Amino acid sequence: MYNESPIIRRKSSRIYVGNVPIGDGAPIAVQSMTNTRTTDVEATVAQIKALENVGADIVRVSVPTMDAAEAFKLIKQQTSIPLIADIHFDYRIALKVAEYGVDCLRINPGNIGNEERIRSVVECARDMNIPIRIGVNGGSLEKDLMDKYKEPTPEALLESAMRHVDILDRLNFDQFKVSVKASDVFLAVESYRLLAKQIVQPLHLGITEAGGARAGSVKSAVGLGMLLADGIGDTLRISLAADPVEEIKVGFDILKSLRIRSRGINFIACPSCSRQEFDVISTVNELEQRLEDIVTPMDVSIIGCVVNGPGEALVSDIGLTGGNRMSGYYDDGVRQKERFDNTNIVDSLEAKIRAKAAIVAGRIPAQDLNK
């Protein structure tokens, strides 16, 4: 069933990255980052479009050189999704991509340079109505902070962030969001909690360098889940050493699990045991692949026997409960006379889910499909 989340989100100010609202109650935006060579325009554009196809709201692109900045110009012309330029070391690159229509600038306080350079970036951003993300990272803190704290600590990440928030405040620039990422879950979580008490600007969440697809997804789910459950977070990125498309899928899965933002089908499936009347695991895997194109939020329960099947089906849009040779089918929690042959479950259930998705899409207000 389509249920609202009980989480009360932190109040924050509103900015826009392109046409995507961030903060002040807007849907939490899911983003990823390209891992192609930015100078390979064709490959980068293809990856951006692949990310957009699986639901990305925003895509970040690394722009390490002036040659990459020139490539960014071409990339921007060939894509429609809002793009963030990731800038390190050379502030002049930020000024260049601003000319080319970048939707947001990410700068790293640990390496972007002195206040005068930041001032140049801020004045350019103000003139061109471009928001900024202050992106603090536990792996690249300023030298004086490392000398002071000896290692990355929540207080060190907070001080780095607030140092640059204060600069933007002095420059009367409020169109920014902030992140304080770390690869350690507890370090990141505590840093974000401290920061959330200090500022009203939107917060971008992430566990940086989280790891490969499996371990990184788990680490991100634990860390971001703790923060999101506290109501903290306005955008997020799942950092995986994997195909960036997987980052978007995991991001939506986390939001879906917390009922914060639902996109696509939430499969409720048993791990299976000797009581299963059909192959639950292969059924779920096949349906997940076939139904990736559905964006309508739905709960579908697929349970291999009658122990928990009927109970889960009662609170699902569509439910399947394993039976001897034929499995029971539920629609909106009501058992139907129709039963599914256990040898043809995938095709039959796919057809029912697609038909149901069309019905659900019609009864849920259009604006809620993006929540």
Swiss-Prot record:
Q: Please write the reaction equations for the catalytic activity of this protein.
A: (2E)-4-hydroxy-3-methylbut-2-enyl diphosphate + oxidized [flavodoxin] + H2O + 2 H(+) = 2-C-methyl-D-erythritol 2,4-cyclic diphosphate + reduced [flavodoxin]
Give the metabolic or biological pathway.
Isoprenoid biosynthesis; isopentenyl diphosphate biosynthesis via DXP pathway; isopentenyl diphosphate from 1-deoxy-D-xylulose 5-phosphate: step 5/6
Keyword match Iron: yes
Task: State any single GO MF term.
Answer: 4 iron, 4 sulfur cluster binding
**What are its cofactors?**
[4Fe-4S] cluster
Q: Which Pfam families match?
A: GcpE
Function statement: Converts 2C-methyl-D-erythritol 2,4-cyclodiphosphate (ME-2,4cPP) into 1-hydroxy-2-methyl-2-(E)-butenyl 4-diphosphate.
- What is the name attached to this protein's record? 4-hydroxy-3-methylbut-2-en-1-yl diphosphate synthase (flavodoxin)
Natural source organism: Shewanella pealeana (strain ATCC 700345 / ANG-SQ1)
